[in-house]
Amino acid sequence: MADEYLVPLDQYLAAGVHIGTQQKTKDMKKFIYRVRQDGLYVLDVRKTDERLKVAGKFLARFDPQSILAVSVRLYGQKPVKKFGEVTGARAIPGRFLPGTMTNPAVKNFFEPDVIIITDPRADHQAMKEAIEIGIPIVALVDTENLLSYVDLAIPTNNKGRKALALIYWILAREILYNRGEISSREEFKIPVEEFEMKIVRR
C-alpha cells in the first residue's frame, strides 16, 4: 500500500530519525513537522519515508559500482561501509581525500555516476567535487542544512548513530528490492544492527 511506512513509525521514532537541531534553514522548512518547547525542530517522518522510496527507485537504476556513498561523520562510517557491501556501491568512510573524483593522479581516483552524501556540511569536499563533475547528489539533510545543489534530499537526523544505521539499512533494502534482487522487503534478512557504529566503552 502506498500509504504504508517502509518500517513501522515506532522504529523511525525509536532511532531518532525525526530529531533535528535547534537551527532551521529556509530550505528545510517544508520538511519540518513542528518545533518543541526547547527550540528543537522535529522532522516530518512521512516525508523521510516518501523520499527513501523515491531514492531507492532512483539509485536502483544505476550500475552498483557507479554509486558512491560518503561519510566523514563517525556515526555514518559503519552505515556507508555496510551499505556498500550490501549493494555493491563504493563507500568512502572517514576522510575524503581532495581530488578523489576530480584528479586522475590521486591514488584512489574514482568518477561515480551518482553520490550519496551523509551530511552536506561535514562532507563538503565530496559535495564540492560532485558539483564540479556534474553528477546527481542524493543527500541526507537535517534541519540546519542547505539544499543548494542537492538533487534528492532525504530529511533525517544525519548525526545520530541509530538514525544513520536505519536510514542506510532502509536505503540498501529499497535498492535491492527495486533491482529485483529480492522479491519482497521481508526477504532482506540483514539486521539493522549490522549497519550501526558500535560504541566501545572503556
From Swiss-Prot:
It holds the Pfam family Ribosomal_S2. Keywords: Ribonucleoprotein, Ribosomal protein. Gene3D superfamilies: Glucose-6-phosphate isomerase like protein, domain 1. One of its GO terms (molecular function) is structural constituent of ribosome. One of its GO terms (biological process) is translation. One of its GO terms (cellular component) is small ribosomal subunit. It comes from the Archaea. NCBIfam families: uS2_euk_arch. Belongs to the universal ribosomal protein uS2 family. This is Small ribosomal subunit protein uS2. It comes from Pyrococcus abyssi (strain GE5 / Orsay). The gene is rps2.
